[in-house]
């Protein structure tokens, strides 16, 4: 585990910010497999900056994020710590080893958050193109509803399948393609993840754990640019997005 010194007391604008949004810790889930990339996706450079560094920089610059806890594989801890130093990620307080499953990793991160945290924002380390606006809107809604996450509408026709054949259509107006950060009250998501583990569930996102408890998650507007970099094609698309942003 790598531990960083906490930054100096928040300036006035930070104290003013906390009057309208609660203390929020971002947990960056920076583990997982990179088999589809042939190399570690987190350290692939997009326009000269590693994917994980770009992700951290967005949360570092957000005025609604107070702390960053990074959960990663043991062999990546030192490398990520070096990147935090290189890119001045001063909000990063801890880098911890993740678990065998995503739920275990998120729980490991929750165990390290500040006692002041009233919200926890769980974000995929491989989503470097999330924007400050998405983070802020989702934090504010989670502060009111206890759970919130960004989504985008499903555009393709979706079918159920059985034995290799179509078995009926699914109304895409009732579907949402979920993104991160997914933001919750710490006690809510911790209880939900522990219950999901006890129930033997295998989940691909954290909202599913909360839904398993019978609770609802408020949906905020995501972005088609908030992609998860998992394939070589994603790298090309991400670089195109960065180029377009630089030309605006």
Question: Where does each model-flagged region fall?
Answer:
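Acidic helix N-cap motif at the loop->helix transition within catalytic regions
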Residues: 78-83
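Short aromatic/basic micro-patch
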Residues: 45, 129, 169, 183, ...
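A recurrent flexible, glycine/aromatic-enriched loop bordering the glycosyltransferase active site
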Residues: 168-178
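Conserved beta-loop-beta/alpha segment of the NTase-like Rossmann-fold superfamily
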Residues: 101-165, 179
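Conserved alpha/beta core of the MobA/IspD/sugar-nucleotide pyrophosphorylase nucleotidyltransferase superfamily
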Residues: 2-5, 176-248
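Residue-level signal for inorganic ion chemistry
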Residues: 28, 52, 109, 123-124, ...
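Conserved donor nucleotide-binding strand/loop of the catalytic core
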Residues: 88-100
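N-terminal glycine-rich phosphate-binding loop and ensuing alpha1 helix
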Residues: 17-77
């Amino acid at each position: 585990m790598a531990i960083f010194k906490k930054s100096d007391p928040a300036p006035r604008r930070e104290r003013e910010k906390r009057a309208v949004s609660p203390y929020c810790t971002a947990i960056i889930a920076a583990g997982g497999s990179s088999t589809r990339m042939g190399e570690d996706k987190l350290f692939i450079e997009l326009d000269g900056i590693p994917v994980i560094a770009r992700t951290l920089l967005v949360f570092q610059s957000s005025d609604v994020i107070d702390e960053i806890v990074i959960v990663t594989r043991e062999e990546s801890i030192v490398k990520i710590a070096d990147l935090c130093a290189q890119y001045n990620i001063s909000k990063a307080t801890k880098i911890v080893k993740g678990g065998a499953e995503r739920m275990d990793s998120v729980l490991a991160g929750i165990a390290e958050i500040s006692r002041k945290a009233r919200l926890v924002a769980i974000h995929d380390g491989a989503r470097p193109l999330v924007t400050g606006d998405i983070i802020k809107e989702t934090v504010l809604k989670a502060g009111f509803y206890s759970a919130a996450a960004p989504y985008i509408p499903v555009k393709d026709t979706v079918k159920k399948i059985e034995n290799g054949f179509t078995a009926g259509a699914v109304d895409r107006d009732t579907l949402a393609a979920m993104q991160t950060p997914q933001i919750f009250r710490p006690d809510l998501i911790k209880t939900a993840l522990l219950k999901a583990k006890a129930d033997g569930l295998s989940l691909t996102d954290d909202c599913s754990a909360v839904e398993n408890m019978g609770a609802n998650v408020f949906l905020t507007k995501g972005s088609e640019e908030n992609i998860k970099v998992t394939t070589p094609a994603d790298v090309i698309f991400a670089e195109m997005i960065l180029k377009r942003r630089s030309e605006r």
